[in-house]
Regions:
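Active-site environment of divalent metal-dependent phosphoester hydrolases
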Residues: 16, 42-48, 68-71, 121-124, ...
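Core dinuclear metal-dependent hydrolase active-site scaffold
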Residues: 1, 100-137
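Conserved beta-strand hairpin/beta-sheet module of binuclear metal-dependent hydrolase folds
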Residues: 1-27, 31, 125-147
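Active-site neighborhood of phospho(di)ester-bond hydrolases with catalytic His/Asp-centered motifs
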Residues: 9-11, 34-42, 62-64, 115-118, ...
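Flexible, acidic/histidine-containing loops and adjacent segments that form or flank the divalent-metal
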Residues: 67, 73-76, 87-117, 163-165, ...
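Acidic/histidine-rich helix-loop elements
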Residues: 9-15, 73-84, 149-160
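Accessory terminal helices/loops
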Residues: 133-135, 145-227
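Active-site HxH/HxHxD metal-binding segment of metal-dependent hydrolases
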Residues: 15-16, 26-103, 131, 200, ...
């Protein structure tokens, strides 16, 4: 929520658009105040609702180049590791392509986008600062970066994807990060951290990336062993 409008990241599956809109209204925020729509990764369960939300809010949609292709076509990209398992999604026009590591500014809001391919090749991780009085925290909404795929897909057959994946993990692990969020909450242990009473942990991004690096290495080892 910003001084001149609001930003929404991700839109859930296609049938979630109206639900998300109702929740926004319940918070006392006018739908017309939502000015920009963003995404983490371009799977139907995260971006399927963006078409409806764009219709309801009139917001502009920003996306990475590969995510924009999927959004405007209405189908996942063929080089997606999970291509065979993911559903079509309502096609929607993208208003701005976010090349490389971009910055999105709206009033007093500044969000930094980091290209973090891996879970999908068009995935983005977001970083911004949020303040309550003089108490400011850096928030990172990191893409899940889990090394999962459709049956028959081998990461070891796509070394370029593996290299990009590893670069993404290094990038996320090095980010300044007081509070970590992720589109799949379980990927970043959100429930356990909430039960501990605070989400503030300056080591959260490093710990998150390190755990995912171990998952990726284990997946590659299994593939090398023919499993």
């Amino acid at each position: 929520i910003g001084s001149t409008g609001d930003v929404l990241i991700d839109g859930g599956p296609a049938d979630a658009g109206d639900i998300i809109a109702a929740n926004i209204t319940q918070l006392g925020v006018a739908l017309s105040d939502v000015k920009i729509l963003l995404h983490t990764h371009e799977h139907h369960d995260h971006v399927g609702g963006l078409a409806r939300l764009k219709q309801l809010t009139g917001a502009r949609l920003f996306a990475s180049p590969l995510a924009a292709q999927a959004l405007e076509r209405g189908t996942p990209n063929p080089d997606d590791p999970q291509y065979a398992d993911h559903h079509p999604l309502p096609a929607v026009r993208v208003d701005r392509i976010l090349e490389g590591n971009s910055t999105v500014t709206l009033g007093n809001l500044t969000l930094k986008a980091y290209a973090t391919p891996g879970h999908t090749l068009g995935a983005l991780t977001w970083q911004w600062q949020s303040c309550e009085g003089d108490d400011c925290k850096t928030i990172v909404y990191a893409d899940s970066l889990t090394p999962v795929s459709s049956d028959g897909y081998k990461f070891t057959d796509h070394r370029d994807v593996v290299a990009a994946f590893n670069n993404s993990l290094v990038r996320v692990g090095s980010l300044q990060c007081d509070i970590l969020l992720s589109p799949h909450p379980s990927a970043s242990g959100l429930r356990d951290r909430l039960l501990k009473g605070s989400l503030v942990d300056p080591t959260a991004c490093f710990t998150f990336a390190n755990g995912l690096k171990q998952q990726l290495d284990a997946r590659l080892k299994k593939e090398d062993n023919g499993e």
